[in-house]
Amino acid sequence: MNKKKRRVAVLLSATIGSAVLVLSGCSGKSDQTEKTLRVGVITYTQDDPFINGLTDELKEQLKAMENKEQMIDAGCDVLCINLVDRTAPSRIIRMARNEDIPVIFFNREPVREDLVQWEKLYYVGCDAEQSGIMQGEIAAEYINSHSEVDKNKDGKIQYVLLEGEAGHQDAISRTEYSVKTLMKNDVILEKLSYQLADWNRGQAENRMNRLISQYGKKIELVMSNNDEMALGAVEAYRTVGYAREDWPVIFGIDGLEEA
């Protein structure tokens, strides 16, 4: 069997998080021409640790690139896009279609009406429903085996929810199925409030501080759409200085090592 060698080069824009991933593969034979695949990668933010985890190992080879149009002009064979707004991919779809460049959306799913526009549009992402169910199952198992979670002993768990962002399908599904799963597992809930924190630790800490100011020690459970926001909630409680036994239980999603 022939051994294949691959070189990877990435061009990334610091402003919009764009990259061109160049994959070159060739066999050991000298008479074969090297084949190169140029993949444009566009992420909505470089501040999201989950997204950064996809590109960290490539950062040594970063160079500037301004926008999606330049990726198409650069001759990319495929575009991989993490949308800023899942409801507004029409322009990039039109541009890619005009050049016959397949598009793979990831982590933020476009609305179905956009995905069915063209047979070369794809979506790759986690199963948000399953994530919500798993979070609910883990939380329910803990709550049902730790009676101290119900601090006021009223038979209900007073909770707040940190949601990723308005209109994000993953946030909607994670929220819906985590709460449904808790109730399905005989956890009686009383919702105190919810806050949007844009998947961000700092914003979650600020929102959690507001919730603590409003509800104090009434909060018995914090459900978060991701680990970053859950860690923000932890920081808020550290800042407030509550004794550890007065903290609520806090659950996130993503499996970040720090969490």
PLM-predicted stretches and their roles:
Residues 6-28:
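Sec-dependent N-terminal signal peptides of Gram-positive bacterial secreted proteins and lipoproteins
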